[in-house]
Amino acid sequence: MIKKLLTNRVASICLLILGAFTLAGIFAPVIAPHDPNLSDFTKFFAPISWEFPLGADHLGRCILSRLIFGIRTTLFYAFFTMLITLSVSTVIGIISGNIGGKIDNFIMRTCDILLSFPSEVMVLSLIGILGPGITSIIIANFIAKLPWYVRMIRSSVIRFNHQNYVLYSNTIETRFRYKLFRHFFPNIASEIAILASMDIGWVILSISTLSFLGLGVALPTPEWGAMLSEAKDVLLTNPEQMMYPGVTIMIVVATCNLLGDSMRELFDPKERA
């Protein structure tokens, strides 16, 4: 899959951008010029300089350093949310599509109930119940996205259940774990990857939006949405304070969406047709 992605120019550029952000987040203590929470009231709203490559905020903190460390609390939490969502939904979807019967009916009716609520309404409702915080955001986004993936994976499993190699495995009573990793997962991996790459952008926007509203990451932890919230009071006098985190969010979300579109063109037979 990776080799095929690298043959597409847009996908290669998107992977390069996401890889650069990921590496910057991992090595943030080395790359960032300052401690992201270090305040210097003698340098508030400092202009761009060698000391502050993107200037300083209202507390004299380095904006570039906070953007770099913000990768950990925005992008990495989005990756983690999608990872647990995909892991759980893959297992549930394959079990539902492979076993059928009352278990399948119960899982599907539960998904129907969850899907009857708009994702944004469900996320806000769950955070209202669980309380603000990044843990609540991860749980809320996980529950909001889980039924979508369970239904998609289940339908794919049902489609592959009628293939000869799956029927043969059922005939000789092959272990479920073998069928999971040998038959089902390789066939649905591309579909999962396409949806996940586009939904990462949605999760990033969700984390940033909720942090902007004060329901996410607690200050002074650097996070892109929280940085936007802090900068909104000086929008007219120092618009660059909102521009830097806003443009960063736009670049990452657009990159994820373009990567998803490129993967769909490469791996979806309907798109190729």
What are these regions, as identified by a protein language model?
Residues 28-31, 78-112, 124:
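Transmembrane-helix boundary motif in ABC transporter permease subunits
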Residues 124-125, 129, 133-145, 192-227:
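Non-cytoplasmic
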Residues 1-4, 34-82, 229-246:
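Periplasmic/extracellular loop-to-transmembrane helix junction in inner-membrane transport proteins
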Residues 56-61, 98-99, 168-187, 228:
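Short helix-to-coil transition segments within interhelical loops
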